Amino acid sequence: MNDIDIINSQFNTTLPLEITPELRAGFPSPAEEYLHDSLDFNRDLINHPEATFYGRVTGDSMTDAGINDGDIAVIDKAREPHNGSIVVAFVNKEFTIKYLDTTHKDQGYIELRPANPKYKPIRIGPDDEFEVWGVVIFTIKPWN
């Protein structure tokens, strides 16, 4: 079940880049001048920098959600989880990344659902040690 390793988020998030205002996915645009700017992940992508952490995904339990072995999950601990959120949960002393399913809450349990039919949901009952540690807001993935 241990399919995410938390990474220290204390690093410089500013990258000096030459970027264009838009990247067209259809026909190429005429040559445009490059803008000299910087991309700061905390400023441009993260709403709660002080509550955001990164985790390296290991395993294949979330492949049908597009989350693969080696991806880096960006986790916001300040975001409120809801039914269907992809969360990082701490279950019985281990971290895992799964869909949160609260539809059985009135029956005394919730489930953490994988996105791969090879795996079964994890049923969380009142006797389990459980905490939603944060909500996955996006992933960073290698393409090569």
Predicted regions and their residues:
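Short, positionally conserved secondary-structure boundary motifs
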Residues: M1-T63, N83, E94-F95, Y109, ...
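Soluble "head" domains of membrane/secretory-pathway proteins
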Residues: L100, L112-A115, V136
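Short, compositionally biased
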Residues: N83-D106
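Hydrophobic beta-strand signal
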Residues: V74-I75, V88
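Charged, well-structured alpha/beta interaction segments
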Residues: D64-A65, A73-V74
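Structural motif
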Residues: G70-D71, S85
